[in-house]
């Protein structure tokens, strides 16, 4: 069975942010190696935790490692994308929860498994599917999507300033022969980036691989849908903790949380008291994102990009 090498970042801060109640109902939307799930379980007495992952590897791993909690009926593992949060919980007759945690970092051996095609460091067939059951793969994106669509995803999801020249090189190469492996794609990406730019800013394929992975798995679309459902599922006093590792995800979370905690546009400015029914139903627990301590940064280089945002439901209403 595959081992999970992922070191959980901001573990204590994210779980503490949920303010776990011993008899509450909680969701770990990103099971992965089970780090956050275990930390939440330690605080539950008669409560229940539903942990989601669309990757069969993660489910199988945790069935074995968290067997006791499952047998004690404290834990339910759900094999599905977290964009189906509400439907899955509804199937267990769960209408409201006390807290939901998201760790959007890479936490599965799928990224360490060269055969899955996520890494520009290992040669493998182009794949990048987190859910092996889905049809769309990186092979199709790279070889079949039109130039304009490639430019769009490279720029939007990879924030790649050489998106046009990279997309043009991909288009030219695939006319000769399909791009079938990660190393073939890396070579094409390098051709699309000026030599001077390749010498700075890390691996030249990093941004493009991120963009293609996000497109293949519709990561931002899934996150937005899931957070909308999560906010709706919360009981009063319930919280959502979200750990992001890249600016696109953090921007989305920040924007959605700001919308939920801001006054309605109908409220006149400068009122000494906000009229009843117009107050926000949510509040931010931390105005600025929580970041890793110096100690954690020294122990785990991945923690440098981690940001934790927490929101609480303070009253009923939409």
From Swiss-Prot:
This protein's name: Ribosomal RNA small subunit methyltransferase H
Highest classification ranks of the organism: Bacteria, Bacillati, Bacillota, Bacilli, Lactobacillales
SUPFAM superfamilies in UniProt: Putative methyltransferase TM0872, insert domain, S-adenosyl-L-methionine-dependent methyltransferases
Pfam families assigned to the protein according to its UniProt record, in alphabetical order: Methyltransf_5
Similarity comment: Belongs to the methyltransferase superfamily. RsmH family.
E.C. code: 2.1.1.199
Superkingdom classification of source: Bacteria
Gene Ontology CC entries for this record: cytoplasm
Localization, UniProt: Cytoplasm
Catalytically driven reaction(s): cytidine(1402) in 16S rRNA + S-adenosyl-L-methionine = N(4)-methylcytidine(1402) in 16S rRNA + S-adenosyl-L-homocysteine + H(+)
Keywords: Cytoplasm, Methyltransferase, rRNA processing, S-adenosyl-L-methionine, Transferase
